[in-house]
Amino acid sequence: MRKTLKLEIRKPQYVVCTDITYAQVDSWYDHCRRDLKLDLIYPEDREDKVYPCIVWICGGAWLRMDKSAHLAYLSRLAQNGFVVASVEYRTSNEGTYPMQLQDVKAAIRYLRAHAKRYRIDTNRFGVMGESAGGYLTCMAALDQDSSLDVGEYLEYSSAVQAACPWYPPTDASAFPYDDVEKAAMSPESQLMGFNVMTHQKEAWDRSPVSKVTAAAPPFLIIHGTEDHTVPYSQSEKLYNVLEKEECDVTLLSLDGADHADLMFFQDEVWAEIVHFFREKLFREV
C-alpha cells in the first residue's frame, strides 16, 4: 500500500535542548567552578517568530532537584506557543539563601541575552515552580532588589511578567512546627541558614508575603486543600496580601489534593495554566 499526503505547515517543530550552561559558580569550598544548566523546549518553524518564555523551577525542599523531571508535562506549554526553560539551581547543601534566587535570576538574564537564538520574546517572561520551586517562583516575581542580580549578563533584566507558583511556602516565619529542634532541622531553616522559629523577623524578611507591592505581576497560585507538607494557608496568605494591594491574582484550589498530588497533572489544571499564561503573556505590552 502507498499513500501520499499533501500538507500545509500549520505547526512548528519542537526542539528539546538539554544541559545548556547558563552560568558558572564557585563550588567545593570556592576552590573549583561548576556549571549551572537548563533544559529548553522551543518552537522551530520557517517564520521569524518569537514566543513568550516560561521558566520552570523544580521542587525538592531546596535539598535536591532535577530540572529534567517534568519535561514531558512542560512540553504542553511549548505546544501552546511558549518557549519553556527548566532551570537548575544550587541546593541548600551548597549554600543558603539568596544563592538559589540569584541562580534563577541569572538563568532569566541568560535567556534574554540569547533570545534571538531561542526565539524568545524578551518582553514576555513567566515563571512557574512547585513547592521549593514555588517559593523561588514567588521571589523571582516579587523581589526586584538589584543586589540579587550577580554574575553575567547584568545588562539584561531578570524581571518576569507573570507567575504561577504551585503549593509554595510563602511565610517562613509562620510554619506550624511543634518545637524549636524540629524547626531547626526544617528545610526552611536549612535554606535560610538560621532557625526560622527563633528568628521570625529574619524569616519574614525572606518570605514572599513580605515582598508584595502593587507592582507585582499577575499571579496564578495553585494549592491542594489537604496539603500535609506546605499548609494550604500559606497560599491563602499570599493571595490575601496580593489582593489587598489590588494585584491581579487568582487562587486555584484543588479540592482534597495533597502536596505534589497527581491532581496537579490532570488536563483541567493544565488548561487553567495555559489559559493564564496565554492571557497574561500574549496581551499587548
What are these regions (language model features)?
Residues 1-285:
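Alpha/beta-hydrolase superfamily serine-hydrolase fold, recognizing
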